[in-house]
Amino acid sequence: METIVKRRKNQGVDKKMAKFWHYLGNIAGAILSLALYIELQVFYFYPQRIRLDHMRALVTALVTVIVLFVIFNLYKRQLKEHNDLGFNQAPHWDMRRIGIAIIGFVLILIVSMVMLSLVGRGVSNNQQALNKIELHSKGLFEIMVVFIAPFCEEVVFRGMFFNIFFTKKKITNKWLGIIVSGFLFAYMHDPMLSKFIFVYWGLGMVLAWVYMQTKDLRYSMLVHMCYNALGFI
């Protein structure tokens, strides 16, 4: 009898340790992905630092493909290990979710206008920095902001975030996750915690809502890309 009890206790300990290492591994994957994304920005925002002359474009393209591949596959690997909420299930495209993405795009425009009117005039430190970077990026700035940044940020702040936190099927978990995901997204864009953090927070929550409603990153990425593209029209 004692042997059975000990065995059950050991099994319980083993499960807890496995859960702990799984959780730690997912956090490490998210940190690695964010670090790769930040390093990739150097190729687009500060191309003059990459002293490769005529090989610069080829190296930039190659590094981009590798980074995006690694980040997205880390996300998919997390889903293979644990995916109770049913993310990234095929088929990936349908009219219902396209409709949600359209609603999300309209919402993000409304939230942006409302929040900007509430916080008042001015430009966030993040936007000021981006404006300066754009002057020296030699045409690569738009590619990063419109395509690569939304891809990487959605994988990390929506995909990986909901693989690590708020993983249980509860309505409170869903909305708390949307709020926290939005804040982390906002903090990355405004670490000085200025009044503009509320603008980014609102945008991040809309993108998190789109992801949670569609259960597919493709839709929040699409909304994010379309919103960022408006800045260049």
Identify what each model region corresponds to.
Residues K6-K9, K15-K19, K76, K80, ...:
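Context-gated lysine
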Residues L107, K138-I233:
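Transmembrane helix-loop-helix hairpins at the membrane interface
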